[in-house]
Curated annotation (Swiss-Prot):
The gene is M. GO terms for molecular function: structural constituent of virion. Signal peptide: none annotated. This is Membrane protein. The chain crosses the membrane at residues 21-41, 52-72, 81-101. It comes from Bat coronavirus HKU9. CDD domains: batCoV_HKU9-like_M (cd21570). It is a multi-pass membrane protein. It is found in: Virion membrane; Host Golgi apparatus membrane. One of its GO terms (cellular component) is host cell Golgi membrane. Homomultimer. Interacts with envelope E protein in the budding compartment of the host cell, which is located between endoplasmic reticulum and the Golgi complex. Forms a complex with HE and S proteins. Interacts with nucleocapsid N protein. This interaction probably participates in RNA packaging into the virus. Residues 1-20, 73-80 are virion surface. The keyword Transmembrane helix applies. Its main location: virion. InterPro entries: M_batCoV_HKU9-like (IPR044360), M_CoV (IPR002574).
Length: 222
């Protein structure tokens, strides 16, 4: 004896659901594609800012979703996974804030809360220190000056001549400060050059931030 009764969704309901949600899904997928492909400072800064804002929101949203799943569990197994995911998300979010505050105390820059990286490059330039995020750790960094405009990794850092560039730049991390010494300056044409800095030492120091009003030292929390 066979049971021919099956719990299936009627085809018209499936087609109706696809018609209702197809446009919304396509918009969401397009939005994600644009963020992933164009969300870089060297391509489109407004999209990159939106991408960073979404990254900031993902941690609290994931924690809230896990807590909600623990309060209203489907079963005991789902309750256990919800508690585990909530704890993992909370620990990782706390770790992010600890690293960000350590980097803030080392550099004094709001870029320390950048969710995409925990490294900041610091360039003493014409009486001030320019700080920007850097994604990858490398034994050498390169700057490009085009007609007096200093560029690095998609960022425009300001206007200067090749002779205004410092001999030393630093890259700060939560647990260390890396020093880079200028190793090559290749002048191309008027007020344009390529400059290469090579890492030569690592230490546990503060970043000295110079401004037009005087010298300021960022406090460091070990």
């Amino acid at each position: 004896m066979s049971n021919n009764c099956t719990n299936t969704v009627p085809r018209p309901e499936v087609i109706a659901a696809l018609k209702d949600w197809n446009f919304a899904v396509s918009v969401i997928l397009l939005f994600i594609t644009v963020l992933l492909q164009w969300g870089y400072p060297s391509r489109c800064k407004p999209i990159w800012v939106i991408k960073m804002f979404i990254l900031w929101l993902l941690w609290p949203l994931s924690i809230a979703a896990a807590v909600f799943a623990a309060i209203h569990p489907i079963n005991s197994v789902a309750f256990g996974f919800a508690i585990a995911f909530a704890c993992i998300s909370g620990i990782m979010w706390l770790s992010y804030f600890i690293s960000s505050f350590r980097l803030l105390c080392r550099t004094g820059s709001a870029w320390s809360f950048m969710p995409e990286t925990d490294m900041l490059i610091n360039i003493p330039l014409l009486g001030r220190t320019v700080t920007r995020p850097i994604i990858s750790d490398s034994p050498a960094v390169q700057f490009l000056i085009i007609r007096g405009e200093l560029r690095f990794d998609g960022f425009t850092l300001g206007r200067c001549d090749p002779g205004d560039m410092p001999d030393i730049v630093t890259i700060a991390r939560p647990n260390a400060l890396h020093w880079y010494k200028r190793a090559l300056t290749r002048n191309m044409y008027t007020r344009s050059a390529i400059l290469v800095y090579i890492k030569y030492k690592v230490g546990n120091h503060r970043v000295q931030n110079t401004t037009e009003d005087g010298d300021r030292l960022a406090m460091f929390v070990a």
